[in-house]
C-alpha cells in the first residue's frame, strides 16, 4: 500500500533503482521454540511482497517531488510557533513571526507533533521500556531477498535485505538496560552478539555503519480530526516496528 501511495504522488520515480531491494519471502521464528511462520510472494502470485528502501532515499524522493510540484510552496527552514483555530480558517504563526491562514491544517509532523499539541488532541501513551538499535551490517551469506525476524527472550531482531546481496538493515529491539549494554560493546563484540542472537542464520555479521538507538513508545491519538485540523501518519499513531512495518503503517 505504501509503495502504491509513493507511485501515485510521483515520488517513486525519484528513487535510485540501484538502491531498491525487493523481498520475495518473509521468515519469522521464535528462538526458544519451534514456532515459525513464512510468507512467500509465490503464494499470492506476486513477483515480490514489497521493497526495502532506505529512509534517506524515501526522504530525498519526497523532497524532490515536493520541489517539482506546482501545487506546493516550501517554507523552509521555518517552523510552526502557534496555531489558532477559527470557525472558517486557521491562523498560523511561524517562528519568524510571519503569519499564514488556511482553511485546513494537516499535521504530518511526526510522533512529537506540534500540530497535535496545539490542537489539544488527547492521546493514549504506552512505554515499551525498550530501545531499538538500528544499523547496516554485512552478512557472510546472501540474504536472498528475504526479510527475517527472530523473537528473542529480550526482544525481536529483524534483518531487512538491502540492494547489496550481503547487506541488511537491522532493527534490534531490546530492553533498555540490555540495549545500553549492546551500545557500549566494541564493534567486534557487537558483531559476535548479533551473529549469535540471529542464530547464525546468515553466517557471521559485520557492522558497516554506526549504531543508532531510539526509544520505543506506543502513541495513539484519540482524535484525528478537529475544527480546521487533521493529523496523519506518526502524528496520529506509532507502534512497535515489527518486521520493519512501522513506516508502512504510519503511511497507511
Locations of regions flagged by a protein language model:
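Conserved FAD-binding catalytic core of PHBH/FMO-like flavoproteins
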Residues: 6, 105-211
Amino acid at each position: 500500500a505504501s509503495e502504491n501511495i509513493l507511485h501515485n504522488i510521483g515520488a517513486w520515480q525519484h528513487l535510485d533503482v540501484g538502491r531498491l531491494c525487493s523481498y520475495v519471502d518473509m521468515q519469522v521464528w521464535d528462538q526458544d521454540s519451534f514456532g515459525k511462520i513464512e510468507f512467500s510472494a509465490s503464494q499470492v502470485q506476486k513477483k515480490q511482497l514489497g521493497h526495502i528502501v532506505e529512509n534517506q532515499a524515501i526522504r530525498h524522493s519526497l523532497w524532490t517531488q515536493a520541489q517539482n510540484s506546482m501545487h506546493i510552496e516550501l517554507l523552509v527552514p521555518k517552523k510552526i510557533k502557534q496555531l489558532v483555530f477559527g470557525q472558517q480558517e486557521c491562523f498560523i504563526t511561524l517562528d519568524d513571526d510571519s503569519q499564514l491562514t488556511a482553511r485546513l491544517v494537516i499535521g504530518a509532523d511526526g510522533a512529537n507533533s506540534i500540530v497535535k499539541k496545539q490542537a489539544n488532541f488527547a492521546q493514549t501513551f504506552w512505554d515499551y521500556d525498550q530501545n531499538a538499535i538500528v544499523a547496516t551490517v554485512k552478512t557472510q551469506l546472501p540474504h536472498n531477498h528475504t526479510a527475517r525476524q527472530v523473537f528473542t527472550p529480550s526482544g525481536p531482531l529483524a534483518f531487512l535485505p538491502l540492494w547489496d546481496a550481503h547487506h541488511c538493515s537491522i532493527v534490534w529491539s531490546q530492553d533498555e538496560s540490555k540495549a545500553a549494554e549492546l551500545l557500549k560493546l566494541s564493534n567486534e563484540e557487537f558483531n559476535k552478539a548479533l551473529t549469535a542472537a540471529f542464530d547464525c542464520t546468515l553466517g557471521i555479521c559485520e557492522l558497516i555503519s554506526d549504531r543508532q538507538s531510539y526509544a520505543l513508545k506506543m502513541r495513539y491519538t484519540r482524535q484525528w480530526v478537529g475544527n480546521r485540523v487533521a493529523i496523519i501518519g506518526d502524528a496520529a499513531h506509532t507502534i512497535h516496528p515489527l518486521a520493519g512495518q512501522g513506516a508502512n503503517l504510519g503511511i497507511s
